UniProtKB/Swiss-Prot annotation:
Transit peptide region: 1-28
Single GO BP term: pyruvate decarboxylation to acetyl-CoA
Protein name: Dihydrolipoyllysine-residue acetyltransferase component of pyruvate dehydrogenase complex, mitochondrial
Keywords: Acyltransferase, Lipoyl, Mitochondrion, Transferase, Transit peptide
Low complexity bias spans: 235-252
């Protein structure tokens, strides 16, 4: 009786697959679940006597990703694949990402064509073989021949109901993933493991944002154990009825239905949840920008081409200084406790053709203006080109949304959960203000309005007032930024 155990080694987050060959030629395959960022690879000998091959599945490239759109394949059938080669482009809910491979081989079959939308995480995308001579033998291979089980929309209903405690953990956050989906082995930094142990958290329920899906400190800090209850079917039906009626009443040719991108779907879901669940309130302050504008001009004049500061760069730096003075605002709602951050990581709202994304400038309290300016320009450009890496837009402790480039005097923004606050920055408007030093008793000054949206569960009105007062003082006396 022929039997052998084959064990693929764990390599940078690639899932482990065990195979057992038995005498009748059949194969039993036991797969561990997809580890974040990397694809699930399943080595198998299928029942149709295909040669040894590897099935490459749709990876989870961000904590909130459940489906992805397939862009252009960078390899053709028969091409050799080296570690680090890009197989194809995948549009996630946040960006367009190059899907790199970790093992060498030859591309033998493409199962999902370029342009396919809403491909579920875990669905087979392609097949590779180790030997070039085996490529032709895979020509008739189909998804049904794959050992990887296709995800089903009803899979959650078909499984036995978990205990209420486990179910709560599994559905508590977009960054959660069940142990069954994740596999037995979890990659985490020593500090992350220590923090998880202190907080009594199950690492298998946390999706990592570090290199190749590794769980790092920020993942532990951002893990949310509580989620909003889903609306009842009756409530959902009532909510959708007016929209359906309006659509039915519209005359043909009066409108165009635009498909939703993955990013737009996630924006709709997260912001609706934030607005419905987080008790928002707003505090607005008017800032005289005379001195900050003069400081910007002076610094740019002496830059000698090394940098070019924008008003937004100075706003980021001033906001950072204000957060250090009022740290209660640099916080997050974590369900049964409030997390107050010691570091300042500014999420910067950037408009892209696909929707809004918030790249994170980390540790702005330790960066100079030139460094902030360089990072802001780089992240902004790559965000608009869908070239951000997942770790560059995940996390953040405080968000700034600046519409100062438009003629928008003032606006309010929706909080980016789990953060407690977001600052909405308007344009600078020449405004008549009192001036005791002028014979006329007034002057015209460039005034900018900033509105802080706060989660009242975390930040009380007095805290918001102290923060906006500190921000106003720093912007109107910008030498404080240098301290």
């Amino acid at each position: 009786m022929l039997s052998a155990n084959m064990l693929r080694r764990m390599h940078h987050g690639v899932a482990v697959t065990r195979m057992l060959l038995v005498s009748n030629g059949k194969v039993q395959v036991k797969k561990s679940a997809l580890y974040p960022v990397m694809a699930k690879l399943a080595r198998t000998y299928a029942t149709k006597n295909y040669p040894a091959h590897t099935v490459i599945n749709m990876p989870a490239l961000s904590p909130t990703m459940t489906t992805g759109n397939i862009g252009a394949f960078q390899k053709k059938i028969g091409d050799k694949i080296e570690p680090g080669d890009v197989l194809c482009e995948i549009e996630t809910d946040k960006a367009q990402i190059d899907f790199e491979q970790q093992d060498e081989g030859y591309l033998a079959k493409i199962l999902i064509e370029t342009g396919t939308k809403d491909v579920p995480v875990g669905k087979p995308l392609a097949v590779t073989v180790e030997n070039e001579g085996d490529v032709a033998a895979m020509a008739d291979f189909t998804i049904e021949d794959s050992s990887a089980k296709e995800p089903s929309a009803k899979s959650g209903e078909e499984k036995s109901a978990p205990s209420s405690e486990k179910q709560s953990k599994e559905t508590s956050s977009p960054s959660n993933v069940s142990g069954e989906e994740r596999g037995d082995r979890v990659f985490a930094s020593p500090l992350a493991r220590k923090l998880a142990e202190e907080k009594d958290l199950d690492l298998s329920q946390i999706r990592g944002s570090g290199p190749n899906g590794r769980i790092i400190k920020v993942d532990i800090e951002n893990f949310k154990p509580v989620v909003a209850p889903k609306p009842s079917n009756e409530a959902a039906a009532k909510a959708t009825t007016p929209a359906a009626s309006a659509a039915d009443a519209a005359a043909p040719g009066d409108y165009e239905d635009l498909p939703l991108s993955n990013m737009r779907k996630i924006i709709a879901s997260r912001l609706a949840e934030s607005k419905n669940m987080n008790p928002h309130y707003y505090v607005t302050v008017s800032v005289n920008m005379e001195k900050i504008i003069r400081l910007r001009a002076a610094l740019n004049a002496m830059a000698d081409g090394r940098y070019k500061l924008s008003v937004n760069d100075l706003v980021i730096k001033a906001t950072t200084a204000a957060l250090r003075q009022v740290p209660e605002v640099n916080a997050a709602w974590m369900g049964d406790f409030i997390r107050q951050y010691k570091n300042v990581d500014i999420s910067m709202a950037v408009a892209t053709p696909s929707g809004l994304i918030t790249p994170v400038i980390r540790n702005t309290h330790a960066l100079g203006l030139a460094e902030i300016s360089t990072l802001a320009k780089d992240y902004g450009q790559r965000a608009r080109n869908n070239k951000l890496k997942p770790e560059e837009y995940q996390g953040g402790t405080f968000t700034i949304s600046n519409l100062g480039m438009f003629p928008v005097d003032q606006f309010t923004a929706i909080i980016n959960p789990p953060q407690a606050c977001i600052l909405a920055v308007g344009t600078t408007v020449d405004t008549v203000v009192p001036d005791s030093t002028s014979e006329k008793g007034f002057k015209v000054a460039p005034i900018m309005k900033c509105t802080l949206s706060s989660d009242h569960r975390v930040v009380d009105g007095a805290m918001a007032a102290r923060f906006t007062t500190a921000l106003k003082k720093i912007l109107e006396n910008p030498l404080e930024i240098m301290l």
